[in-house]
């Protein structure tokens, strides 16, 4: 397929909002034993539940290794789920897959950002990561979609959210981290985002959620629910290490105007827990040099904000937590025309993320 040397914006493309119509959702099958406990079996059950929940609303394509293809195909026994063979290093397609962009002529293309496992040799979560850096290209080859590659710019899809009308939200903790693009200034990073996603206004939150090992991805902390309205992870507990992070984010959001000049409406979503892995859960993860150690004393970055908007539905994590019911009620209130489906998210959280992190929506073509 073609690899344009221009930029999406120059070619009339933009990143659509997540609530715009999807053609399908992409996922990657988990198996890495130094990240997923017990050989990945509990995580595979969790991913299966997520895939089947999404498949109620739209088609799903799951990428699996050659070794796991037969197992994945057998477990994902749903006529709306396709399984394709792709080699990967891990299962975070939000960060390794393409960021799809659309135009008004019915075309869909993809941005293939550079990937360095959330920090490369300065805080990255595993090595090597070359197969993960190829995931976006392989997906775009399968779909026969043109690819914009940013060889000299590292970005993960979980570090950005857009409203589809020219505004992007991100965090300084991630995008300005020296382990991503140390050769670029904030203004230069903004320029790349503007050129590749067709955004005009960028809202910088200082930090993401406490102990988020991705260096504070915004998709675990704050997201758009519609143009002009965001959902922010929240705690009123002044002793919670997230308290100051939430307060700082709220100040920025309340002071900001989006690309259309609107003042943002901020909805608050309680943070579950605090949640921790058990010793047994940690012991089930293989110990391999260069991988992320698991420790039951380290708080997990659990968040109800880490959900996926699908065609007519919301697929969100539950944690067997007292706040689960409140989270569901809030999601139903801010998405009154969507069906909210809660899926157990603990096993995904133990691996370092949640439902939004393990999914990547492919927008449907549109014509103006």
Curated annotation (Swiss-Prot):
It comes from the Bacteria. It comes from Pseudomonas paraeruginosa (strain DSM 24068 / PA7) (Pseudomonas aeruginosa (strain PA7)). Keywords: Hydrolase, Polyamine biosynthesis. Homodimer. InterPro entries: Agmatine_deiminase, Peptidyl-Arg-deiminase_porph. This is Agmatine deiminase. One of its GO terms (biological process) is putrescine biosynthetic process from arginine. It is an enzyme of class 3 (hydrolase). One of its GO terms (molecular function) is protein-arginine deiminase activity.
